[in-house]
Amino acid sequence: MRIGWALLALSACGGPIARSPGDAGSVASPDASVVPPEDGGVPQADAGVVSRGPTLAGCPVFPPDNAWNRDVSSEPVDSHSADYLAFMGASSLYLQPDFGGQYGQPFVVVPADQARVPMSFLYASQSEPGPYPFPRDLPIQANEDRHATVLVRDECRIYETYNTYASGSGFHADSGAIFDLASGAPRPDGWTSATAAGLPILPGLARYDEAVDQGEIRHALAFIAGGTAHAYVAPATHSSGSTNATYAPPMGLRVRLRADFDLSRFNGASLVILRALQRYGMFVTDSAGGQFWSVAGAQDSRWSITDLDQLKTVPASAFEVVRLGAVHSGQ
């Protein structure tokens, strides 16, 4: 799907929406079994301890063994890693954090008794039907994608839509998807979601509560690449790629920051994000025209732009492609 740079998160009624730090829900404290290293490298879990997966508002954000939460720091590099990186312009591009205090992906946590409203979808055959628990002041991403993400507390499901607009007593969107955070079940093969990859939005966001409050991100991130193939690899289930080029990245391709990339000059949230990229990597979940590596994150007024600007000094050439699984033709 498409991306447009934006400066404000808009409500469904068209005005700016403010979110306090508490709106993201309660988050469990960091896993005591994981000790941040002194040298800026990837933190190591205690021997024999399986680190638990991420949580948000009392909900697991997929099981610990889900693809999003799997440590891939020791997995093999794909034999065509250099070819994929060359197609993605890695030799001349740098990371671009697509989030901050005034832009990024907003989301809201609602109670289980949140009123459900009717939904209509352009791609109804690949969308879970309504009603959805969308509040009237639903925060909507302020770019041309107009993504919306709602987490229902206790139910532990996320409801996500693409190209979202208020319509009558409910909302209209191009597509809608519901993900069960406890099971981590993927979309049916060939189905889209609020992203072109059929993947969820919320689990792939860099969030302030993790990067700063907890000091650790225990999952992969999502990024948008310029130009993708008509193909996808698990955990993706769909593609809307623009090319049949041999080494165009399929949706679901995972890159990770190389272990030998020196992190000693980084600090704060940026250091935490880079450690996560070494351990869990990031998935291609969407595409856009041009060439860039746009890392997804939650809009949060507490982000320090000075801190996040450190990410812009990380060259895309410092990444490598984790070995791909079976490649499926796109939808």
Where are the regions that the model predicts?
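Ser/Thr-rich, Pro/Gly/Ala-heavy low-complexity intrinsically disordered linkers and tails
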Residues: M1-S51
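Short, surface-exposed polybasic-aromatic patches that bind anionic ligands, especially phosphate groups
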Residues: G48-Q331
